[in-house]
């Protein structure tokens, strides 16, 4: 019986997904902070607009393309990282705002 | 040259300039009749806020001529076909195994930009997007005349260093050829 309980617990642990992390990126002084980020598949990035102007989360990198729309001051958006790869986040309004994201398994 | 011929030449020149200015506008960009045959899809952009997926196309002739890091060739046409995303029973977008939205066949709107030599000359410097012109079409491919193109010009002006494109120029740079 002990063996079967242990086996069941081990199987359950093995099946459980690894804890996803949330990474916070500030949009401040017309820049993302940080400007580089490493994350795992399943993690999320929370973008917080701390500026007094609109910003955006736009990715043109092929295979990762996404546009979360215009983000007003104090607003937050969340990007879920669903696949591996390297991509660049940019602000539609401010061409020099760039964030490089590297996602691994 | 006689006064008469000088006058005629001046009138012709003024007429040409006036015609160029008068015809500047979205109506210069037509929906490509052979879109399905003549274009290639090079990117997709999820729009979760709109519950939509944007499929991005370029005409094959321009794609063949384009080079990484160079302005797009004259005659380039970029099309964004915005389609409704597949939704779950709660009305939220479904995602595939890679976390991407799944486009349906239902077209919401079609955005187009086309580059022709001299098209930008009619616009002031603070608006001009090189020689690009914009238009928006309804799902039935007729122009959506309710849409003002000022937003297109002002937004794309932020990517002057990429020949005013958000995706294609960067995608070629990323590809390296």
Positions of PLM-derived features:
Chain A
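Bacterial N-terminal signal peptides that target proteins for export
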Residues: 1-6
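Extracytoplasmic copper-binding redox domains, predominantly the cupredoxin/blue-copper superfamily
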Residues: 10, 15, 19-105
